[in-house]
Amino acid sequence: MPKLLYLSVSPRAENSYSRQAGARMIAWLERRHGPLTVIDRDLAADPVPHIDGAMARASLMPAADRGPAEHAALALSETLIGELEAADIVLISTPMHNFTVPSALKAWIDHVVRSNRTFRSTPAGKVGLLADRPVLAVVSCGGPFHDGPGSQRDMMTPYLQYVFGSVGITQVEVVRMENMARGEDFVARGFERLNAWTGSLAIRAA
């Protein structure tokens, strides 16, 4: 049975359009691939703490030199990396906050993007140490992305693609549901965009 790691990020619970989209995506994936084992990581209800000094020190220490305190400091990071390693597909449902990922998702990223654990630094740049797999990101945006008044830049899509790529995961697909704060007509268009996007996806679960 394929394993899905589902990262939900919005603090708006049932009022969240990204969470509604995430639920639709899980149903779509199950229609396509059959039953899934879902690793449900709700980063709003159960937030991952930001990196503290103990973890920063432990992560920079050679593995052979770590003692019980360092292993304890890295325990949550190891759990989160293990969930990512176990997943055949990763699904992220998230709003865009101030042009990029919410801090709750950034904290998760900081725990899983770790030197000499999920990537290795070389003179040519970072080399990912994880196996590739599909990452599907559904992003709910309050405003538009186009040239003209009120538009904003998308710095989130290239960031997600780059950060997952740095650990070896290159199959990153992102859909933006735009103008979701502008009324029911725009919300309907956002979900139409989601439906069109899922129809164009070509992914394979293990």
Curated annotation (Swiss-Prot):
The keyword NAD applies. Keywords: Flavoprotein, FMN, NAD, Oxidoreductase. It comes from the Bacteria. Its EC number is 1.6.5.-, 1.7.1.17. InterPro entries: Flavodoxin_fold, Flavoprotein-like_sf, FMN-dep_NADH:Q_OxRdtase_AzoR1, NADH:quinone_OxRdtase_FMN_depd. FMN binds at S10, S16, Y17, S18, S140, C141, G142, G143. Binds 1 FMN per subunit. Its cofactor is FMN. GO terms for molecular function: electron transfer activity; FMN binding; oxidoreductase activity, acting on NAD(P)H as acceptor; oxidoreductase activity, acting on NAD(P)H, quinone or similar compound as acceptor. It catalyses: 2 a quinone + NADH + H(+) = 2 a 1,4-benzosemiquinone + NAD(+); N,N-dimethyl-1,4-phenylenediamine + anthranilate + 2 NAD(+) = 2-(4-dimethylaminophenyl)diazenylbenzoate + 2 NADH + 2 H(+). Transmembrane segments: none annotated. The keyword Calcium does not apply. Pfam families: Flavodoxin_2 (PF02525). Quinone reductase that provides resistance to thiol-specific stress caused by electrophilic quinones. Also exhibits azoreductase activity. Catalyzes the reductive cleavage of the azo bond in aromatic azo compounds to the corresponding amines. Homodimer. Belongs to the azoreductase type 1 family. This is FMN-dependent NADH:quinone oxidoreductase 2. It comes from Cupriavidus pinatubonensis (strain JMP 134 / LMG 1197). The gene is azoR2.
